[in-house]
């Protein structure tokens, strides 16, 4: 039977150096090799870095892979709009509250710029994560908010409005993503994006 295996990023299993995840990686590779033995199987990726990495690890043939350049968004919802004028630039970080998503780096950047009397508003919207060693605790987030380092918005049901109210959207994730939806949405609205040179963000 035809099989499609779709990836929105390879995740921490393929990027972490922790022993448990290294062991899980070996089991995962073995499972993918078994799946790939079906020549009617297609492995679908959001960007070429992930495709090349997994193809090398699993031994995929090129005709078994395809790159779709992101899952896409609805441009009728995320319509282009002119930037709003603000006294200081507004930067939006909207993501799950994980250290690896790069919020800590944005905080450090804000501290450095603030010491040089350069200011911006850092709006943070996102989902708190439980039972994850990589999670940023609510206590840390509220402490940043109280120090004026961030404007904590919590979980939002209307990210489009937050993007429209921003000048810049930042997602400095330190590990390979798929193609992050928030960056696609920001680009569609016409906002500058900040990200590290990692898979899916380059």
Where on the chain are the PLM-derived regions?
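Nucleotide-sugar donor phosphate/pyrophosphate-binding loop at the beta->alpha transition
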Residues: 2-4, 12-35, 39, 74
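Donor nucleotide-sugar binding/catalytic pocket of nucleotide-sugar-dependent glycosyltransferases
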Residues: 29-80, 90
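Conserved donor-binding/catalytic core segment of Leloir-type glycosyltransferases
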Residues: 82-101, 106-110, 122-123
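Glycosyltransferase donor-sugar binding loop
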Residues: 94, 121-136, 152
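Nucleotide-activated donor-binding/catalytic signature segment of Leloir-type glycosyltransferases, i.e.
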Residues: 135-156
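Short acidic alpha-helix that forms the nucleotide-activated donor recognition element
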Residues: 154-166, 188
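A short hydrophobic beta-strand element within the catalytic core of glycosyltransferases
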Residues: 170-171, 186
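Short hydrophobic beta-strand element within catalytic cores of glycosyltransferases
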Residues: 192-195
């Amino acid at each position: 039977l035809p099989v499609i295996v779709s990836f929105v990023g390879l995740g921490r299993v393929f990027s972490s150096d922790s022993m448990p995840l290294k062991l899980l990686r070996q089991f995962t590779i073995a499972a993918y090799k078994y799946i790939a033995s079906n020549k009617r199987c297609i492995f679908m990726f959001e960007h070429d870095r992930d495709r090349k990495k997994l193809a090398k690890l699993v031994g995929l043939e090129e005709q078994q892979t395809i790159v779709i350049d992101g899952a896409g968004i609805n441009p009728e919802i995320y319509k282009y709009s002119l930037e709003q004028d603000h006294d200081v630039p507004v930067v939006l970080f909207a993501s799950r509250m994980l250290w690896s998503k790069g919020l800590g780096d944005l905080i450090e950047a804000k501290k450095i710029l603030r010491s040089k009397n350069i200011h911006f508003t850092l709006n943070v919207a996102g989902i708190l994560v439980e039972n994850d060693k990589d999670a940023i605790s609510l206590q840390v987030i509220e402490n940043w908010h109280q120090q004026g380092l961030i404007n904590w918005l919590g979980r939002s049901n209307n990210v489009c409005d937050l993007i429209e109210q921003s000048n810049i959207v930042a997602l400095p994730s330190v590990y390979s993503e798929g193609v992050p939806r928030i960056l696609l949405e920001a680009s569609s609205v016409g906002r500058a994006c900040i990200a590290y040179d990692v898979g899916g963000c380059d």
